[in-house]
Amino acid sequence: MRLFHRLLMATPSTMGSKSSLSEALALLPPLQLYRRILRVHRRKLDPEMRILGDSYVKSEFRAHRNVENPLHIIGFLTEWQLYAQKLEGDAWVGEKLDKSKLDKMSDQQIGQLYELMQAIKNPEGEGKE
């Protein structure tokens, strides 16, 4: 995320994105957001889910470290910031994934989501019931 210096105080509205974020909400820099998510996991998740969540967050941030497309960076940071806010507010329990977000996902992302769902439902890696 080499371009994040220019994007530190950018909002989705200034980048042309039609997001539900208010214009006053600035995106956190990647490192601050990463640390915030790990802190929220420590406070809100039970130990098994925390391990799963932490490893997923670490791998996603690592995979997006060298992304140069500003719109991709904004989308990535926006979604992770919304995730952190939901986790902090307890509004996430039992919430379903928005269909419009699911429609925008690639086949690879849907596969990742399915694997994540299976890991959550079957945390000990047991075989099918």
From Swiss-Prot:
Pfam hit, one: Complex1_LYR_2
GO cellular component: mitochondrial intermembrane space; mitochondrial matrix
CDD domains referenced in this protein's UniProt entry, alphabetically: Complex1_LYR_SDHAF3_LYRM10
Signal peptide bounds: none
Keyword field: Chaperone, Gluconeogenesis, Mitochondrion, Transit peptide
Chief place where the protein resides: mitochondrion
GO biological process per UniProt: gluconeogenesis; mitochondrial respiratory chain complex II assembly; succinate metabolic process
Keyword Mitochondrion attributed: yes
Subcellular location: Mitochondrion matrix
Keyword Transit peptide: yes
Role description: Plays an essential role in the assembly of succinate dehydrogenase (SDH), an enzyme complex (also referred to as respiratory complex II) that is a component of both the tricarboxylic acid (TCA) cycle and the mitochondrial electron transport chain, and which couples the oxidation of succinate to fumarate with the reduction of ubiquinone (coenzyme Q) to ubiquinol. Promotes maturation of the iron-sulfur protein subunit of the SDH catalytic dimer, protecting it from the deleterious effects of oxidants. May act together with SDHAF1.
Quaternary context: Interacts with the iron-sulfur protein subunit within the SDH catalytic dimer.
Similarity field: Belongs to the complex I LYR family. SDHAF3 subfamily.
Full protein name: Succinate dehydrogenase assembly factor 3, mitochondrial
